[in-house]
Structures are given as C-alpha cells and as structure tokens.
Amino acid sequence: MRYLLAVLIAAAFVISSGTSVSTIADDELILSKDTTIGAAVAPTFHDDKRMLQTKAVNGLEEERGWPLLETGIGKIKMGGKKFKHATKRMFGMVSPAGEAKFEAYKGLHKLKRGLIRMYRRVKWWFQKNILRQKHALEEGATRAKHKVSEANQKLKHRTKESEKTAYHRLKEAFQKFRHRMKDFFKKMRVYAY
C-alpha cells in the first residue's frame, strides 16, 4: 500500500512525458502540413490515415477506422494530462494560473474534437448529396441517350417503311401504266386492221 503512491506518481510522469511529446508532434503534424517541422513526418501520418480509410461501394469515402483510432488516442492523451494535473494538484504544485491554463486546454480540446466531428459530418453530408446529384445526372443522361437512340431507330424504321411503300406504289403505278400502254397498243392494232 505504501508503494502504491510511488507507483502512481511514477506512472503519471511516464504517461505525462510520453503524452506531452506525442501531443507536440501530433499538433505540429495537424497544424502545419507543409512547414519544415512537420514535413518530414507528415507523409507517414497521412499515409496511415489513407490506409485506415475504406472506400464504399457507391464511391463515398467512409472513414471507419481512423476516427475511432484518433478519438481513442485523444482520450488517452487527455486522460494522461488529467492524471498529471490531478497528481500535481494533490501535492499542491498547481498555481491558479496553471489551473486556468489546464481548464483552457480542456476547453480547447473539446472544441477541437467537436470541430473535427462537425467537419466530418458536413463533409460526409456534402459528399453523399453531391454523389446523389451526380448519379441522378448520370442516370438522366443515360435515359436521354436511350430515348434519343430509340427515337433515331424509330425514325430510321419509319423512313425505311415509307421508302418501301413509296417504291411499291411507284412500281405498281409503273406496272399499271405499262399494262395500260400495252392495252392501248393492242387496241390500236385492232383498229389498224
């Protein structure tokens, strides 16, 4: 029991030192994608993010694994900071300025998480609706294309039918004319004798 406090203090310092270093690195990555500090580490960070994202069947990017992992990491870091702060407060090592700074940090952390969630939801909503509009336009275009091709086929068929009927009528008229001419010349021969 008497070693429990020492173990807790040691664990708190191990967690807090690990979380403070990783918090600085993550903040640099998130805040400065193109700066010289985060440029060396940023590609692996974003590659990991892309690897954890999955593509849905309809083309929407569904971020399944990454937000859960990111949220878990954020909660672990915040838990470490809370534990470190509580340990310092327990031993009376926190000044009023330090308390205010920690409360401001907690508020900023909540605000950042809320903004990230809101950004993801808005992005997903826009992707979903834009994709829906895109699919509707594509379907409309294919329907119009099919209607135009059907109309063209009907027009071709009607044109061929009208050409055939006109040809048959002309042929019949010519045959009638030939028969009349033959009859006329037969009658003329009869009258000639």
UniProtKB/Swiss-Prot annotation:
- Kindly state which keywords UniProt assigns to this record, in alphabetical order: Host membrane, Membrane, Secreted, Signal, Virulence
Q: Where is this motif: RxLR-dEER?
A: 50-64
Identify the stretch annotated as signal peptide in this record.
1-20
> Record's GO cellular component, any one?
extracellular region
Principal subcellular localisation of the protein: secreted
Q: Which domain of life is it from?
A: Eukaryota
Domain note: The RxLR-dEER motif acts to carry the protein into the host cell cytoplasm through binding to cell surface phosphatidylinositol-3-phosphate.
Task: State the family named in the UniProt similarity comment for this chain.
Answer: Belongs to the RxLR effector family.
This chain belongs to which protein, by name? Secreted RxLR effector protein 126
